């Protein structure tokens, strides 16, 4: 499989049209950043103890900026293949609105800024995890794994799983079994989510030589893997109840959501190979986003309910 690597063919700075603030905001991958902010906030809420609201806001902003910075570095490196893929061709760099060198500088400055401010304002453990997350996504995943192995999403998914752990560390200045479970929920969720996308975007990935699992091992293997990871995610999502940092009620909600997630993955598994419409894969991709938001929302609601009951003198 030939991997596209044509960064030098991109337009030089002088050939760029004038960039707007919106273009730079797009470099931050705002949709991805919103999920990062949400799960990091969940880590803050779920962690035992308290954090000054101002410091909590600074922490969330730093995590958001750090996530956006890694997105900018990803777009800088992937501009050559983004120009070919239909879903990414209109991004600021391949569209000629931002020069690659400007995107690189933007990403590096924001990376340093977010890590240093988080360390100075909150604690250096959370800053170190944020720095490692940026490095992992921009270098380990983007520059190495993405173009070299069909397991790119499995290993690279760790980058997207760190935010709740960072949020937790902002409050406790520690990494615990509870924050590790939050990490694992996202880590195990990522393959089913992205391989569903890879199924109905197979031709795009094939055109640029990115070795996604459907292109390397075929649809059938990918579908088996999607079901396996959906089951593992559903099991992991109920662990907070068994570990004592969420209620039995949360466990029931997580189990119900997990059952739907697995059902959607089985629908993909039953989908005939070569199906051009890929409707079950598209439905799984959409539901997987809702699933993750719903699980972390349920965890936060459960935590807030426990606090309210405790303050009222009851038990939960």
From Swiss-Prot:
| UniProt xrefs under InterPro entries | Protohaem_IX_farnesylTrfase (IPR006369), UbiA_prenyltransferase (IPR000537), UbiA_prenylTrfase_CS (IPR030470), UbiA_sf (IPR044878)
Q: How does it sit in the membrane?
A: Multi-pass membrane protein
Q: In which pathway does it act?
A: Porphyrin-containing compound metabolism; heme O biosynthesis; heme O from protoheme: step 1/1
Reactions that this protein is recorded to catalyse: heme b + (2E,6E)-farnesyl diphosphate + H2O = Fe(II)-heme o + diphosphate
Keywords assigned by UniProt, alphabetized = Cell inner membrane, Cell membrane, Heme biosynthesis, Membrane, Transferase, Transmembrane, Transmembrane helix
Q: Which GO terms describe its molecular function?
A: protoheme IX farnesyltransferase activity
Location(s), subcellular: Cell inner membrane
One GO cellular component, as annotated: plasma membrane
- Locate the transmembrane regions by residue number: 32-52, 53-73, 93-113, 116-136, 152-172, 180-200, 221-241, 252-271, 289-309
Might you give the EC number(s) for this enzyme?
2.5.1.141
Q: What GO biological process terms are annotated to this protein in UniProt?
A: heme O biosynthetic process
Q: Which PROSITE patterns match?
A: UBIA
PANTHER family per the UniProt record, alphabetical: 4-HYDROXYBENZOATE SOLANESYLTRANSFERASE, PROTOHEME IX FARNESYLTRANSFERASE, MITOCHONDRIAL
* Purpose of the protein: Converts heme B (protoheme IX) to heme O by substitution of the vinyl group on carbon 2 of heme B porphyrin ring with a hydroxyethyl farnesyl side group.
Q: Other notes on this protein?
A: Carbon 2 of the heme B porphyrin ring is defined according to the Fischer nomenclature.
* Family the entry assigns: Belongs to the UbiA prenyltransferase family. Protoheme IX farnesyltransferase subfamily.
Q: Which HAMAP family does the UniProt record give?
A: CyoE_CtaB
Name this protein carries in UniProt: Protoheme IX farnesyltransferase
Organism expressing this protein natively: Rhizobium etli (strain ATCC 51251 / DSM 11541 / JCM 21823 / NBRC 15573 / CFN 42)
- Please spell out the taxonomic lineage of the organism that makes this protein: Bacteria, Pseudomonadati, Pseudomonadota, Alphaproteobacteria, Hyphomicrobiales
Name of the gene encoding the protein in the UniProt record? ctaB
């Amino acid at each position: 499989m030939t991997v596209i690597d044509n960064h030098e063919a991109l337009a030089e700075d002088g050939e760029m049209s004038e960039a707007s603030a919106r273009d730079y905001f797009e470099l931050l991958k705002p949709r991805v950043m919103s999920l990062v902010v949400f799960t990091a906030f969940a880590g803050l809420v779920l962690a035992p103890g308290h954090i000054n609201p101002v410091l909590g806001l600074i922490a969330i902003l730093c995590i958001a900026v750090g996530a956006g910075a890694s997105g900018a570095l990803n777009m800088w490196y992937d501009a050559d293949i983004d120009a070919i893929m239909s879903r990414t061709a209109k991004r600021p760099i391949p569209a000629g609105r931002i020069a690659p060198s400007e995107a690189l500088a933007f990403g590096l400055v924001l990376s340093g800024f977010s890590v240093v401010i988080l360390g100075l304002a909150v604690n250096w453990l959370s800053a170190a995890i944020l720095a490692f997350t940026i490095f992992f996504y921009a270098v380990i995943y983007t520059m190495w794994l993405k173009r070299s192995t069909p397991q790119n999403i499995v290993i690279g998914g760790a980058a997207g799983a760190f935010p709740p752990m960072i949020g937790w560390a902002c409050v406790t200045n520690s990494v615990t079994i509870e924050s590790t479970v939050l990490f694992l929920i996202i880590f195990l969720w990522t393959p089913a989510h992205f391989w569903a996308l890879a199924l109905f975007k197979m031709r795009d990935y094939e055109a640029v030589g990115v070795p996604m699992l459907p292109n390397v091992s075929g649809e059938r293997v990918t579908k088996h893997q999607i079901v396996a990871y959906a089951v593992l995610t559903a099991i992991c999502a109920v662990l907070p109840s068994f570990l004592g940092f969420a209620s039995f009620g949360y466990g029931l909600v997580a189990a119900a959501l997990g059952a739907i997630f697995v059902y959607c993955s089985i629908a993909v598994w039953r989908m005939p190979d070569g199906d051009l419409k890929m409707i079950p894969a598209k439905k799984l991709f959409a539901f997987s986003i809702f699933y993750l938001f719903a699980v972390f929302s349920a965890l936060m609601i459960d935590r807030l309910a426990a606090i309210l009951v405790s303050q009222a003198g009851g038990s939960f």
